[in-house]
């Protein structure tokens, strides 16, 4: 299945059992690397953090 079809299928249809539900990024539809705290995948999180769109988040440096 195409990525858009999987995304639409996961957002529109509720699974029969709660354990079957898999979190997806609402911005790009990516099923892996999902950060619950920010409700997006790691790639979208990184892009927005570097642009300064997520308050209180900055790139680590040590």
From Swiss-Prot:
- Quote a single Gene Ontology cellular component term: cytoplasm
GO BP field: translation
* One GO molecular-function entry: rRNA binding
* Binding locations of Zn(2+): 25, 28, 41, 44
Q: Which cofactor does it need?
A: Zn(2+)
User: What InterPro entries does this protein's entry cite?
Assistant: Ribosomal_uS14, Ribosomal_uS14_bact, Ribosomal_uS14_CS, Ribosomal_uS14_sf
Q: Which PANTHER family match?
A: 30S RIBOSOMAL PROTEIN S14, SMALL RIBOSOMAL SUBUNIT PROTEIN US14M
Assembly and binders: Part of the 30S ribosomal subunit. Contacts proteins S3 and S10.
For this entry, the protein name equals Small ribosomal subunit protein uS14
């Amino acid at each position: 299945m195409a990525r858009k079809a999987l995304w639409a299928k996961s957002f529109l249809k509720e699974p029969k059992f709660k354990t079957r539900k898999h979190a997806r990024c609402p911005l790009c539809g990516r099923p892996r690397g999902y950060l619950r705290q920010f409700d997006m995948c790691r790639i979208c999180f990184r892009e927005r953090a570097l642009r300064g769109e997520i308050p209180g988040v900055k790139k680590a440096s040590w």
